[in-house]
Amino acid sequence: MNAPLIWAGLPVFFGVVLWLIKKYPRIQLLVGIGLYALFALLAIFLPIENPLGTQQAGFIIDSSLNILGRQFVLTFAEQPVLMLLFGFSAFWMLGLFSQSHAIRLIPYGLVILGLLTASLMVQPFLYAALIIEAAVLISVPLLADPASRSSRGLVRFIIFLSLAVPFTLLAGWAANLAEANPANGMFQIRAAILLALGFSFMLGVFPLFTWMPMLSEETHPYVSGFLLNLLSVVILFLGVRFLNTYGWLRTMAGVPNALQIAGGFMVLSAGLWAGFDRKLIRLPAYLNVLQNGLALVALSLRGDSPLVLFSALLIPRLVMTAYLCLALSVLAHRPVLEKGAFAAYPFAAVMVLVSIFSMAGFPLLAGFPSMLLLLERLGQQAPATLALVALGLIALIGAGIRHMISMVSPPADLEMQGLAVEPASGLLLNVYFTAGILVCLIIGLFPSRIMPAAEEIVRAFQNWR
């Protein structure tokens, strides 16, 4: 037995098995959540390259697997990343108890997560782009909605992610040439440019993020939210792995500034778009772009702990996005998404606002401690980027205030006729949203509980200095 087979091969296998029993959705849901949780627990307690059991009946889990001449490697130091991915997925799947329309996410999510995990393990790095492309293509049936009249967002999703593949492949090739010819700086410049182009398409660097809000509008918010966040987090970790492996690229003149400029404009543009766009259903896409920009800005900082700040931003992002997308799924039952939402679904409406303000770094909420630390570092190292980030966050807070005013305003008479098409959210959802608000406050009030976990997540990237 080896680690890549456990955390990459088995999820794909079980995802296919669960897809075959789609006629039994309740069994599919329970078994699927159990599998997500099991893989997360194995990432915590199952040691790699350490003997298990007695000397007579023990065994060792190997860290590598060779397939077609390519090596998949997973070390003990990388297990916290797997815990984050599988734990986040298990937490997300809990919301499917109230979202039967999105239950197909269980089998597809396992297959996609297995492939994305494999992309983090494969060596050489350049083959990760091909595995991500396979995950993107497998997600097409998940995102395709037969009831939707438009599929422009899905088409752009495929096009933009596919365009990233050749640039990423060429970036890996150029980086290997640069290592073999360190005296030739042209190879280093080519590798940096190609890598920037590839990740710009994948992360939605301004202005290449137009497909994200379109995809969020066309598909179920709980499905698109999961896929966008999972893809973004894995791609960010791939970028960190690339910079950790090729240290000369991380310290190359102009790379930190490029990360700051790209990240700053992502935060600013996403905040402004969220502020002016009146369609609440598109909000998770803008928040995804904004959080990706904050991650790039964190990676550009100098000092001993940019990676810790990077991972500290991820934890509240994943938690609050899950609650936000679930709340939007509840509000989507109404003929009019926003107006009168407080009267019809008060817990879901409050959860939407708490999520928005948390990701904007509002005091006492989950996103505040890491956001405060990021703004403090930017004030010391990059005041111009600080201005871009601050303007984007202010615009996002303005969007939250505008949505709040719309939610408390009574709907028009014609809208009231369809207000009771769906019953009010049940007790389980109300408890779930209440727990989410409490979790948000606990993370904001006691950030010291999060920092050790953030340090563990990035312990695999030891070359980062």
Predicted feature locations:
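Transmembrane helix-loop-helix hairpins at membrane boundaries of multipass inner-membrane proteins
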Residues: 1-8, 13-97, 106-107, 455-460
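Short helix-boundary/re-entrant hairpin motifs in multi-pass inner-membrane proteins
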Residues: 63, 195-262, 285
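Structural signature of hydrophobic alpha-helical transmembrane segments
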Residues: 1-10, 73-85, 124-135, 187-201, ...
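Helix-loop-helix module between adjacent transmembrane segments
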Residues: 67-127, 144-148, 152, 232-235, ...
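Short aromatic-rich membrane-water interface segments that cap or initiate transmembrane helices
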Residues: 62-80, 188-192, 379-385, 465
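Predominantly late transmembrane helices and immediately cytosolic-facing juxtamembrane segments
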Residues: 213, 312-336, 349, 384-424
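Alpha-helical multi-pass transmembrane bundles of energy-transducing inner-membrane proteins
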Residues: 21-27, 106-193, 201-205, 274-337
